[in-house]
Amino acid sequence: MKKILITGSNGQLGYSCKEDLSEKFDLICTSRSRSKGTLQLDIFDKNAVSNTLKKFQPDIVINLSAFTDVNGCEKNPHLANKINFEGVKNICDNFDGHLIHISSDYVFDGRDGPYDEYSKTNPISVYGASK
């Protein structure tokens, strides 16, 4: 059975992923805060990310960790960048498998939709730029 490591598994998308994937995959569920059935993993901690990926050797990582408060990102762009960019970079720097990263339509300016994964980005907010 393939192993999937899910970051941010305690969020809304995380719960849905766990429900939809648990019967077909071996799931390693992580979150910044500890909870039942979830390993604590701070994706800003390069060593913790590296050690977790080495220990579990997942086939796939689904990154659901994100700072999703759009107004909060505007008020604290440093934190938005740390969560939505630097944490993802830590995963990419330590993982050669398949990464599924959830982005946002905020990476676009809203002028030329509908968009797909090949559309050129043009964020108009801190949140969009951080994603």
Predicted regions and their residues:
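Catalytic helix-loop patch of NAD(P)-dependent Rossmann-fold dehydrogenases
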Residues: 82, 86-87, 107-131
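SDR active-site strand-loop-helix element
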Residues: 7, 30, 61-65, 99-104, ...
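Conserved glycine-rich Rossmann-like NAD(P)H-binding loop of the short-chain dehydrogenase/reductase
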Residues: 12, 25-34
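NAD(P)-cofactor binding segment of oxidoreductase domains
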Residues: 75-100
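N-terminal Rossmann NAD(P)H-binding glycine-rich loop of SDR-like oxidoreductase domains
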Residues: 2-24
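Rossmann-fold cofactor-recognition segment
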Residues: 32-47
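NAD(P)H-binding glycine-rich loop region in Rossmannoid oxidoreductase-like domains
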Residues: 43-83
